[in-house]
């Protein structure tokens, strides 16, 4: 029952701008911390921090690039998050915004992340745009983040 109250309260509270004193810390290309809360972006999957992509036979740390793109996009601006659910890792799965622009949409549309169809189809059109324009990941050879994680688990 407490979880239900927490979730209902959170759905209301966290659609408001997060407190200015709650500094946003970017963990990777699809996860941020705000204060003590951890937000996993809804419907997208960004490369892992250790993930290497290839472009013109050169290794590119595409997870680091995704994280840096998110840091640059947020740029100390206020972040607003709309919580959709709590995942099995107790992360708040949310769509977060800067200046009313979806960070998930920005990351996928610019090729820093892919649509995570297993959980949502909301950003599939944005992925198609990035793919057609060979933006970000789509200008490289890469493993989908979930395939990269599976390879690591199988070792």
Locate the predicted segments by residue.
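Small beta-barrel nucleic-acid-binding modules, primarily SNase/OB-fold domains
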Residues: 2-8, 14-155
